[in-house]
């Protein structure tokens, strides 16, 4: 991982639809000001990560 500390995850506000590619989600999260993002869970939601 990028961070050695714990990561807090927040659903992306700008990402629409089913998250199939981590790179697309990561781009949306960076646009929102987060350092990273990836697809998570059964429902494939775009989750943005930041150090807690």
Curated annotation (Swiss-Prot):
GO terms for biological process: defense response to bacterium; defense response to fungus; killing of cells of another organism. It comes from the Eukaryota. Disulfide bonds join 8-52, 19-39, 25-46, 29-48. Keywords: Antibiotic, Antimicrobial, Cell wall, Disulfide bond, Fungicide, Plant defense, Secreted. SUPFAM superfamilies: Scorpion toxin-like. Distributed in the epidermal cell layer of leaves and in the subepidermal layer region of stems. Not in roots. It is found in: Secreted, Cell wall. It holds the Pfam family Gamma-thionin. GO terms for cellular component: extracellular region. Belongs to the DEFL family. Group IV subfamily. Antimicrobial peptide. Active against Fusarium spp., Gram-positive and Gram-negative bacterial pathogens. This is Defensin D2. It comes from Spinacia oleracea.
């Amino acid at each position: 991982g990028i961070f050695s500390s714990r990561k807090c995850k927040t659903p992306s506000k700008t990402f629409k639809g089913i998250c199939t590619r981590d790179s697309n989600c990561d781009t949306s999260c960076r646009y929102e000001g987060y350092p990273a993002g990836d697809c998570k869970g059964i429902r494939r939601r775009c989750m943005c990560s930041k150090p807690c």
